[in-house]
Regions:
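C-terminal and inter-domain tail/linker signature
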Residues: 1-138
Length: 138
């Protein structure tokens, strides 16, 4: 696939799956061996993460600031905005605005996303006031 094709796949992934939460399109852009470095292995972990986040921030919007591709790799710089109005199990919504700036690395194979490695400031869980336990596997 060309760099432009890869960029378009990532753009589609952000707008249709992450922003709109249309998980029915997930397998159209993610390979069976997809891994998300934040949520865990496989599309199932992304599905669950997206379900929670789209419920918590129903008006979520991604503004792509820049999109750079080199070979099979695409890097996106974005701003995520919205309002924390929906329930997250065990936490009450604050009604506060959400503003997150992030950079995400994507790697594609044969036009499908195989690796998704997001980094954001502040972290999405921090914005929602959710404390996560850190577990170290030995």
């Amino acid at each position: 696939m060309s760099r432009e094709d890869n960029k378009e796949t990532v753009r589609y992934f952000i707008s249709e799956i992450l922003e709109k939460g249309d998980m029915s399109k997930l397998r159209m852009v993610c390979a069976p061996n997809y891994i998300n470095r934040m949520t865990g292995q496989g599309v199932g972990s992304l599905y669950e993460f997206n379900r929670v986040i789209n419920k918590a921030i129903p008006d979520m919007h991604f503004k792509i600031e820049s999109l750079v591709a080199e070979g099979d790799q695409v890097v996106v710089r974005y701003t995520l905005t919205g309002t924390y109005t929906g329930m997250v199990p065990g936490y009450q919504p604050t009604g506060k605005p959400v503003l997150i700036r992030g950079i995400t690395y994507y790697r594609l194979e044969n036009g499908l996303i195989v690796e998704h490695d997001p980094a954001a400031t502040p972290d999405i869980w921090e914005v929602l006031g959710i404390k996560l336990a850190v577990t170290r596997l030995l």
